[in-house]
UniProtKB/Swiss-Prot annotation:
It comes from Streptococcus pneumoniae serotype 4 (strain ATCC BAA-334 / TIGR4). This is Glutamate--tRNA ligase. Its EC number is 6.1.1.17. It catalyses: tRNA(Glu) + L-glutamate + ATP = L-glutamyl-tRNA(Glu) + AMP + diphosphate. Belongs to the class-I aminoacyl-tRNA synthetase family. Glutamate--tRNA ligase type 1 subfamily.
Amino acid sequence: MSKDIRVRYAPSPTGLLHIGNARTALFNYLYARHHGGTFLIRIEDTDRKRHVEDGERSQLENLRWLGMDWDESPESHENYRQSERLDLYQKYIDQLLAEGKAYKSYVTEEELAAERERQEVAGETPRYINEYLGMSEEEKAAYIAEREAAGIIPTVRLAVNESGIYKWHDMVKGDIEFEGGNIGGDWVIQKKDGYPTYNFAVVIDDHDMQISHVIRGDDHIANTPKQLMVYEALGWEAPEFGHMTLIINSETGKKLSKRDTNTLQFIEDYRKKGYLPEAVFNFIALLGWNPGGEDEIFSREEFIKLFDENRLSKSPAAFDQKKLDWMSNDYIKNADLETIFEMAKPFLEEAGRLTDKAEKLVELYKPQMKSVDEIIPLTDLFFSDFPELTEAEREVMTGETVPTVLEAFKAKLEAMTDDEFVTENIFPQIKAVQKETGIKGKNLFMPIRIAVSGEMHGPELPDTIFLLGREKSIQHIENMLKEISK
């Protein structure tokens, strides 16, 4: 590439890190690292009403958890928060006012609302009508004096070139253009509280920080012509823009909504449930981008090497919880036991299950986990007297040979000494039941598994029985025999 790559992730500290924002950060990170460029974090905190205490720390902490690092941020550089850059914004506001490219607007919220209502009733497209339209200089001066005397604080609006065409070649979408007359009229670049609006401040920041490429969600497409107007007004070259497609819920086909509480959408949620960060990183990196081929599991280093902005998808990215869980399970299965056990300890401790067998239990169920918090429901059988059965499990236990199998296996366990009760001796006892009763296959193994564990599927049965212990295994079988005899 001919110019230095400088990209940014610029969150507002208004809450937890959403998976859509995490994707924006991740694609900027991969783009910078692939091209040997600079990835920076800037905090856009001009919306004081939505500001959340500790929101900035939460954003950075969750990005680090995902495995991202950055070259510049408020932690290492001054004035990387918009609230620290107000003097810079004011400098360019004053410049545009002096050049007649912006003006102070004294129209009130009530007047704006009344005009919007009139336009709606008339079937007109909502837009701001310049309040000075048709005024002479004397009338304009009198209007301003009257408004200021009434204590009305003005906003500052950019004078829009209604006949202008604002176009760019989007890295993802291709050629896009807007007519200046379709923007909604002159728009506010400075609010009454002195803070700049987003579409003004972001241009000043990107220019000042020499951002070369702006990669973000396609909900920002409508913002781009306004930003191009500011670049034009200040005589600056705009960066390249790339707008990633939205993320949809794979089950509903609708845009992923933060209000959909049935879907985990915040990185903090995945951390709390015990997903591995590498798995979440991997999953997010494939939301709207893929390297080609059939493989879907890649390390961070492989993603950096493979990342190609030309493969950013033009179609919506499907958020598929089942795919994330499959991917997470793959990472957990292949992680070392020490890592997963350390992650499981808080869950086990809270449930009162951090016993001397805890690490063995984690080892036993690690291949089944989609998230580490599942260690609790998976190990319920070790801490209860009778497992809850599903309809399918109850149906299996109504088989006419079930009591015969359970009585025979219970007798085998009772006959074993403590020294004999080891994992490798348990399967031969099951085979002995088969030989004595003539019952085999599912009719043999399934009743024993369900009676002991309350599950139709799970780890190797001898491993489960050994960890459960001889006495508790016998107790579970006795409880099941009582249940099925009712």
